[in-house]
A protein has these predicted regions:
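Conserved histidines in hydrophobic membrane contexts and catalytic metal-binding motifs
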Residues: 1-503
Length: 503
């Protein structure tokens, strides 16, 4: 590659990183949070629910839900799983309105205290247009990955080490290149699946009206393979045995892992029951993998599956489990892959943060005004978001359950994040302010883990979900370590070695 082409790739990588880096950090951090949140449902429950106990029959829990006012005619029952031992009852739109303790049938508090950051990642609180906007950042990440690989192609021989003793700037450059090169497969996975998740949905919505003029909903029915409509048959004589139906399905398809039971026309003689889940070796979700049964006698009627469908449709279906680390179809290795997926999400956030830092330091030396503007945005938006997430976790675990408390927690999140942004725009020493934010965030995450562990020991007599507590404490310690003021000699600008061109 000639010098002019290399210079253009450098300019693209630096310019795109500076222009989009702050928003990209928000997308990456909120995405990593979303992944962790899905595995922390049980962490938000009362600790006693996670203790192994005999469970009530599913029919008894369904009757309990009906007594509490849940409409079961067309409902979705999310079965207990290791990361959330509760059984949840949701409507046809999959909005869950009730959670029960499967051992006692007692109602459980909502676990949606941290969904504000999940919604931030999925839609930016803007509905479907926000989902499309977020997916565009997958394309931005892909462009940055390609440009970074071209820029650092000579760094492959040194990609296994991070040099020390050459100053903070060189160490951060090496860390940035190390994450980018070794984490490239995961970064491409995040970017590609993230872009397809939103843009694929946009294409489906746009083409549905063309494929089925006047009846666009038929496109979604064909995509999902929903059960055929049935006529009303009057009230049934007795309710079916759902546990027996689950056992029958397990005997028929032993490689299938049930996740939900979907009720259609419950209470009618022609009621149908779908068992949704995932199959071993098939990258799909419970939305597309379903077994249909007649409720009254348990007769199997049909299977809906992505297996055997067109290549592009199967690729589109596989996007969600790959993007959100839903590796249940992998088997025993699924948990390890999910942890690795999460760690690479954190690494992607560090990649973005180090890139922003290097660009700001390079431009701040000649007192470039754009560097000061970007520094204020990066410190306030990125550092403030990390702190707001920690405050949300700590306060959410320390405060009692209640609707008013949930509302106050949402206000706390926005107040902390907004306050961090406002102060970052006003303070003169933004590096010192960033260290303050990181110290506060580190303390918040560590206290969140310690608080839950203490509550678990008091309420259940054992440290349930201790790996999550340990991860929170470790992340808090990492933030506290990173917030330490660097030594004066480490802050001196070192000469960048050959092949380590600064941003």
């Amino acid at each position: 590659m000639d010098a002019s082409s290399r210079s253009r790739w450098h300019a693209l990588h630096r310019g795109a990183g500076a222009l989009f880096g702050v928003v990209l950090f928000v997308v990456l951090f909120s995405g990593t949070w979303s992944l962790a949140f899905d595995s922390m449902q049980g962490w938000w429950r009362p600790p006693s629910v996670a203790v192994a106990r005999p469970t009530l029959p599913l029919d008894a829990l369904v009757a309990r839900a009906a007594a509490l006012g849940v409409a079961l005619r067309d409902a979705r029952i999310v079965l207990p799983r290791p990361d959330d031992p509760a059984i949840r009852f949701c409507d046809a739109r999959q909005t869950c309105t009730l959670a029960l303790d499967p051992a006692t049938g007692a109602p459980l508090p909502d676990t949606g205290r941290a969904t504000v950051i999940v919604t931030l990642h999925k839609t930016l609180f803007a509905g479907f247009p926000g989902r499309i906007f977020v997916s565009l950042w997958g394309i931005v990440l892909l462009v940055l990955i390609v440009a970074g690989v071209v820029v650092h192609r000579k760094r492959w021989p040194d990609a296994a080490r991070i040099r020390r003793g050459n100053g903070l700037r060189v160490a951060l450059f090496d860390l940035h290149a190390w994450i980018g090169l070794w984490g490239m497969p995961w970064l491409v996975l995040f970017a590609f699946t993230g872009a397809l998740s939103g843009l694929g949905a946009l294409g489906t919505v746009s083409l549905a009206g063309i494929a089925y003029p006047g009846q666009p909903q038929r496109a979604f029915a064909e995509l999902l393979g929903g059960p055929p409509p049935v006529e009303a048959g009057g009230p049934w004589r007795h309710a079916p045995d759902l546990d027996a139906l689950l056992r029958r399905d397990a005997a028929r398809r032993p490689d299938f892992r049930p996740e939900a039971v979907v009720l259609h026309r419950w209470g009618d003689a022609n009621a149908r029951v779908e068992i949704a889940g995932t199959s071993a070796g098939l990258p799909s979700t419970a939305v597309f993998e379903r077994h249909l049964y007649r409720a009254t006698d348990g007769q199997w009627l049909a299977d809906a599956t992505s297996r055997g469908r067109g290549f592009w449709l199967r690729a589109f279906i596989a996007v969600q489990p790959l993007h959100f680390a839903q590796y249940g179809w992998v088997g025993a290795a699924g948990g390890v892959l999910r942890v690795l997926h999460f760690l690479m999400g954190l690494a992607a956030c560090a990649l973005c943060a180090t890139g922003l830092h290097l660009w700001i330091e390079r431009r701040r030396a000649p007192r470039d005004r754009s560097a000061h503007v970007l520094a204020a945005a990066a410190v306030g938006v990125c550092g403030g978001l990390v702190l707001a997430g920690g405050a949300l976790l700590f306060a959410g675990r320390a405060l009692p359950d209640g609707v008013h408390v949930d509302h106050a927690l949402a206000l706390l999140f926005w107040a902390v994040w907004g306050g961090a942004i406002a102060l970052a725009a006003c303070v003169a020493d933004r590096a010192a302010w960033l260290r303050v934010l990181m110290r506060a965030a580190g303390a918040a995450y560590a206290l969140a883990g310690a608080t839950h562990c203490a509550l678990a020991l008091l309420g259940a007599g054992q440290p349930v979900y201790w790996p999550i507590d340990l991860a929170l404490v470790a992340f808090g310690a990492l933030l506290l370590r990173a917030a330490r003021r660097p030594r004066r000699d480490a802050m001196q600008p070192a000469r960048m070695p050959a092949g380590a061109e600064p941003f």
